[in-house]
């Protein structure tokens, strides 16, 4: 582990009494400072070019992302905490750069140069508004006046932009509009803003599902797929929508919806892994999954903070685990990586993750939830067997040391081959080893051009979803696959039956897959007509020892040795990297194992020794 990571670990390892959960405020402050210092470091200056000076240069994307002024909230917080003027200066410079380069004729902010999506004005307005609410009285008078003027213009734009209700945008936008109107009401004092936020909330409320999840991250937000799936994305829900609703409720005094929001957090907490990661492998916007959350949303700490303040079970532990995960995923340059193994893959961090998620630490610190609670396990630390979420065709399994998710979800926000379903295991996690396998988008492409990262030196990205493959056809793309799930005798069983499908929807041969997970491990039986491969990528860095001998393969990782045994020869895929594949989705690196079959069944098992 690098020196910076060791320092973070020391900050977070504050003494905790036995049988109690704690999170470290000092550790959160340290991480916030590291991220703010990195943002200051990457801020452009001295060129004399108004199109460049004040923006923040991204080492991964090699340009200045348009939403960098969202960081004003955190930079001003750090100025107040430390008294160091550099943070306030950086906030003013990035705000001014945005005004010169990222504001359209009607006062809206847009996403990036050449990416004129203006809905993100709602995030710019709420970030600026929260800054004015928390620190406006302490800002220099001329600076406050300048920021307040921009806030008014943004607010006026939003009122018109969201005048048609939910529209066709993902639900996090109308939800954040509720927050934006509450913030405007708080700052400007006009009751009309509160009324508009309340009216929008009335449209949003029906998307709170009985299962404890929030629907709406899709087009349309109220849509239901042929399978009956709702557009559910755990990342955007926990990192954007639920925090915005908590803030809306807090500002407007809507105590009546606090219990509903707590129930949503409890439902989404089912998908928090024991290491603080968020299993959004199967979500409707899983193409933006980062393991700790989602690429360009704001962070799940505020949702956990409010839930903890309301006595939510497991909230304090979740805050602690998640903060430690964020620290682990922070680079030596001080920027947040978009997943687990970017460092090991030699890929730089995109600055967007940092300037977006730094806000969530400020929200956590200002909310000041309890730093200690009784010892309360996270739901996925419990060995409960099986839990079903039919609203997006997903099954969770908790058996012995294993935690898994399987999905046949067919409702995705982004058009294109982003699928991870078709009756696939989307997460296989082990108590001692962490992530063993996970699903990632079937064919990697820039679903949102300026919001996606690619490999610096390698062309093409392998999907890491365990699957049947046959010359471009796969079970993963079969939206109509029939699935079954059962838990009995200490084992979870899951099966899928359908037609191998290409990324353009073309149909191929029939297939069947059966999975069985017990305390020992996972077994797979795959069947298809004609020649096929069953592919099972195992998370492994280039430092992890991989040995393939006939029908057996072993992966030695910290925490144990994973052994794959098949009824035929196991092969290891050659890639441009050699014997590993890397995907920007969740930042996973893997050894891609496969077995070959023809007109019959092929079997494989996975255990940890």
Predicted regions and their residues:
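Eukaryote-skewed repeat-based solenoidal scaffolds used as protein-protein interaction platforms
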Residues: 141-221, 228-229, 234, 250, ...
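Beta-strand-rich recognition/accessory modules
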Residues: 567-609
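Solvent-exposed loop and edge beta-strand segments that line ligand/cofactor-binding
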Residues: 41-69, 105-123, 159-175, 211-240, ...
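Bacterial N-terminal signal peptides that target proteins for export
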Residues: 1-7
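Extended polysaccharide-engagement surfaces of secreted carbohydrate-active enzymes
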Residues: 256-259, 269-566
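Bacterial N-terminal signal peptides
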Residues: 8-15
